[in-house]
């Protein structure tokens, strides 16, 4: 059997499987107590860095489209993780704010990424190198998308 047909030799399968394993770890070990999803955590991470922000910033930072982000934000608002407010200057612009609930869970989730890095059994240097290589892959596909 050639390497081309061996799943373990396919970059795409390795990326897919690693992503599934990391998401499972986040869901079962890190976020379960908070009934939080990884995309919700990413939104909170953006807001913990800077709040309020407009929806466009979240869309850009997460590299998702508005059609994906809007329902995500709606669910987060329903469980009191964020508050959405229309701009007084431009009613088309919506700002996202943290809530008391999202501020309360912040200290407990501040090291979530460290927990995953630790569980991965990679050294800090290996994590940096993996992030560099993944950034290269992401950039290459972004370039392909633009052509």
Swiss-Prot record:
Its main location: cytoplasm. It is found in: Cytoplasm. Keywords: Activator, Cytoplasm, DNA-binding, Repressor, Transcription, Transcription regulation, Virulence. SUPFAM superfamilies: Winged helix' DNA-binding domain (SSF46785). One of its GO terms (cellular component) is cytoplasm. Pfam families: Staph_reg_Sar_Rot (PF22381). GO terms for molecular function: DNA binding; DNA-binding transcription factor activity. This is HTH-type transcriptional regulator MgrA. It comes from Staphylococcus aureus. The gene is mgrA.
């Amino acid at each position: 059997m050639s390497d081309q047909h061996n799943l373990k030799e396919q970059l795409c399968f390795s990326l897919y499987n690693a992503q599934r394993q990391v998401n499972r770890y986040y869901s079962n070990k890190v976020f379960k107590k908070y009934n939080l999803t990884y995309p919700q955590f990413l939104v909170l991470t953006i807001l913990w860095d800077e709040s309020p922000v407009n929806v466009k910033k979240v869309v850009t930072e997460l590299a998702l489209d508005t059609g994906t982000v809007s329902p995500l934000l709606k669910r987060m608002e329903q469980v009191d993780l964020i508050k959405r407010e229309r701009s007084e200057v431009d009613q088309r612009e919506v700002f996202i704010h943290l809530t008391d609930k999202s501020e309360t869970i912040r200290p407990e989730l501040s090291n979530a990424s460290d927990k995953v890095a630790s569980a991965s059994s990679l050294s800090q240097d290996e994590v940096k190198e993996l992030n560099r290589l993944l950034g290269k892959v992401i950039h290459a596909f972004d370039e392909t998308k633009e052509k």
